[in-house]
Amino acid sequence: DYEKASEYFEKGLEYDLNPKLEYVQDMVETYGYSLLNQKRIQEMMFLENVYNEFAVSADYVFLMGLAYMNNGLFDKAIDEFNKAKLYKLCKIEGCNSYKADYNIGVIYECLGNKEKALENYKKCGRYDPALNGIKRIGYN
């Protein structure tokens, strides 16, 4: 129940929290995903307000990319997905590699740039959504 989860995250975030603690980072990231899953896209932009404190992980930077992407800020989204790929470690598999490339490909596909979309989809290896993207834009 994302709505109930969001309520609890919001209560938890009212406290004075140390952003260096992993559970605090997890809470902020999970709250962002709960907003995304509820289609509360505009509200995801709160992530900008705490960027300097939390952009210490690929997971957060990737989530910021999703926030920008879903709010139509495509250049910023591409920048964040590329930044996420600079991190060695991540908690969510692929957010510092093929999932970032996939989302960049989706953006280029939406913008009508099939060549750049294909280039990014190809970086995703055997990731099914990227393979479907390649087919969708007319390449096999």
Q: What feature does the model see in each segment?
A:
Residues 2-3, 40-41, 74, 114, ...:
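TPR-repeat structural position
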Residues 9, 47-48, 81, 121:
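Hydrophobic/aromatic packing residues within the alpha-helices of TPR/SEL1-like helical repeat arrays
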Residues 13-26, 87-94:
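Flexible helix-coil transition and linker loops at the boundaries of alpha-helical arrays
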Residues 13-14, 52-53, 82-88, 125-126:
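Amphipathic alpha-helical segments of tetratricopeptide repeats
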